[in-house]
């Protein structure tokens, strides 16, 4: 898998940005080896994005073991789920290269060819130490008590069923022995639910590596919940269905987790309940196209992460890329909460159509509310009808950084949209920047929105449905103006603008500098807590970079010329027609 550069963003930039390039403003941030500006004065090799590349960053499988330092407190549903609170002192060794039937420490081990079954019955504190290789075998665990499976250089391939079949129904602690490589794979035959199947809770620990390949169904499947913890280095691939599947919850507390799926409408990480991400680095690649579900009678697309309940991101990193038609990066049936961490999403496929139904590509989609209070979210969609961030209900941003560069609407809510803090960038290549189908409230934060051109607008609300844009606070830059009928409690000002140019907007003692796109809507609207001043053609040194270097807070501004600002009032001719254009396909 091709490696790409990942440049970490620091708070203070030491680079100097120059203005008035004749090229597209994004092109100067394309990776040029070690000379790329990163908005933080530091360059490090790794995987995924390059700061300054909102429109060009990539996502690739990265099995390097260095975990992100940013992490929230680990979450486990039950105190018994912590390995350190358990004592598995009764070890039973199983060598799959030369399996031996035996009864040891109350554990019965039976062997049939390369297939091994171990039953610890009512014995407590049992730890199976598994090593060796089998190309036509399996390991099945039975028992009435919780247990541990320590993988210490085990390689299991079962052409006919699951490679590791944990049928106890009790807690299963998978311990990846440090310094060992372990592999599990099934074949294309059989009715197994996964190459690694667990009937009970599945809890990963240890700092070894594990590769799981599902060729018949899922890669890893638990009928209960799954927890990944710091130190894990796990790669999962499925050519037939989902990568990782859990019925009752998925909790990513740390570790390195890489997932690839290729089947139509398959999900990289799929949970029938809640998903919580607190740490680690999770990378998911999905390549399957959409498909028509004859049972549900609807078109469906693949997704990097799919939660049937809620998704919460508190820390760590998510890197998601979907190249199939109708695909999503994140698809949540209930609420999506982003409290911290970093989320990077790419979708490349276009809309999928079948049987008079459609599945449209989305970076992040939630049927419930979306709330952002911290962290960083970058989204890019390039396929036809692809929206960046979409909720069927309300959107609330109170902090963090949100940047969406989308084919269709960059950020869309079916109901109310409220921005009261944070830094928000929204560029719709063929539609609005921010689009609320209810009221849109901007109360604080810094908002930089760009639309494609008339009749679209940078910031839109559903005036046709009787709703409005209410601007009462914050710092606002809108390339393409505001929807007609806006209620502007905070004064707004307008001017013309030049493409590919750096501007500095100063409000009181605070300066926000931004680079304009190569094309966009007519007219520029700006607003701040007090009357702003605007300069064009400036250079900026220092400051804090946002949106991949397209916006800078603070820093030292030099050069340029003053821009004449005139008062902007709603309906003054810059905004588009009736707002609140319908979302580009809810599914």
Which residues does each predicted region cover?
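Positively charged n-region of N-terminal signal peptides that target proteins for export
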Residues: 1-5
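Sec-dependent N-terminal signal peptides
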Residues: 7-12
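Residues within alpha-helical transmembrane segments of multi-pass membrane proteins, especially transporters
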Residues: 13-14, 282
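C-terminal motif of bacterial Sec signal peptides marking the signal peptidase cleavage site
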Residues: 15-19
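A composition-driven surface/loop motif
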Residues: 21-587
């Amino acid at each position: 898998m091709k490696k790409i550069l990942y440049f970490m963003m620091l708070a203070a930039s030491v680079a100097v940005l120059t203005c008035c390039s004749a090229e597209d403003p994004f092109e100067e941030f394309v990776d040029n080896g070690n000379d790329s500006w990163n908005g933080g004065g530091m360059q490090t090799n790794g995987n995924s994005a390059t700061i300054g590349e909102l429109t060009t960053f990539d996502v690739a499988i990265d099995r390097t073991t260095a975990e992100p330092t940013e992490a929230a407190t680990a979450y486990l549903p039950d105190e018994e789920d912590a390995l350190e609170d358990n004592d598995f002192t009764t070890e039973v060794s199983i060598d799959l290269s030369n399996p031996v039937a035996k009864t040891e420490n109350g554990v019965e081990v039976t062997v049939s060819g390369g297939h091994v079954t171990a039953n610890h019955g009512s014995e407590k504190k049992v730890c199976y130490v598994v090593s060796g290789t089998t190309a036509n075998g399996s390991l099945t665990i039975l028992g009435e008590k919780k247990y541990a499976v320590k993988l210490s250089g085990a390689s299991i391939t079962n052409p006919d069923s699951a490679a590791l079949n944990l049928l106890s129904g009790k807690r299963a602690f998978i311990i990846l022995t440090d310094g060992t490589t372990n592999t599990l794979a099934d074949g294309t035959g059989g009715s197994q639910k996964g190459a690694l199947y667990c009937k009970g809770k599945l809890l990963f620990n240890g700092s070894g590596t594990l590769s799981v390949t599902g060729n018949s169904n899922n890669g890893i499947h638990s009928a209960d919940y799954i927890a990944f913890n710091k130190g894990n280095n796990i790669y999962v691939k499925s050519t037939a269905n989902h990568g990782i599947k859990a019925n009752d919850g998925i909790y990513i507390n740390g570790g390195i987790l890489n997932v690839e799926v290729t089947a139509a409408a398959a999900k990289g990480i799929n949970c029938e309940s809640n998903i919580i991400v607190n740490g680690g680095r999770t990378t998911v690649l999905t390549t399957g196209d959409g498909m028509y579900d004859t049972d549900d009678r609807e078109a469906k697309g693949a997704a990097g992460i799919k939660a049937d309940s809620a998704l919460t991101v508190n820390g760590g990193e998510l890197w998601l890329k979907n190249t199939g038609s109708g695909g999503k990066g994140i698809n949540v049936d209930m609420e999506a909460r982003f409290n911290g961490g970093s989320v990077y999403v790419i979708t490349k496929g276009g809309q999928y159509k079948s049987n008079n139904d459609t599945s449209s590509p989305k970076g992040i989609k939630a049927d419930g509310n979306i709330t952002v209070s911290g962290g960083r979210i970058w989204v890019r969609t390039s396929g036809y009808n692809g929206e960046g961030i979409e909720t069927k209900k309300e959107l609330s941003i109170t902090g963090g950084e949100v940047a969406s560069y989308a084919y269709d609407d960059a950020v869309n809510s079916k109901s109310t949209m409220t921005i009261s803090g944070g830094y928000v960038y929204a560029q719709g290549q063929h539609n609005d920047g921010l689009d609320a189908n209810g009221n849109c409230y901007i109360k604080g934060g810094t908002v930089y929105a760009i639309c494609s051109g008339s009749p679209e607008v940078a910031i839109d609300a559903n005036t046709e449905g009787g709703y409005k844009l209410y601007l009462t606070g914050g710092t606002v830059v809108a390339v393409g103006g505001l929807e007609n009928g806006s209620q502007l409690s905070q004064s707004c000002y307008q001017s013309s603008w030049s493409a590919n140019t750096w501007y500095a907007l100063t409000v009181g003692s605070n300066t926000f500098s931004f680079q304009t796109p190569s094309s966009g809507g007519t007219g520029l609207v700006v607003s701040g807590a007090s009357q702003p001043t605007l300069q064009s053609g400036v250079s900026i040194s220092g400051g804090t970079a946002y949106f991949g270097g397209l916006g800078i807070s603070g820093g030292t501004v030099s050069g340029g010329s003053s821009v004449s600002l005139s008062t902007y009032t709603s309906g003054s001719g810059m905004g588009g027609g009736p707002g609140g254009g319908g979302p580009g396909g809810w599914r």
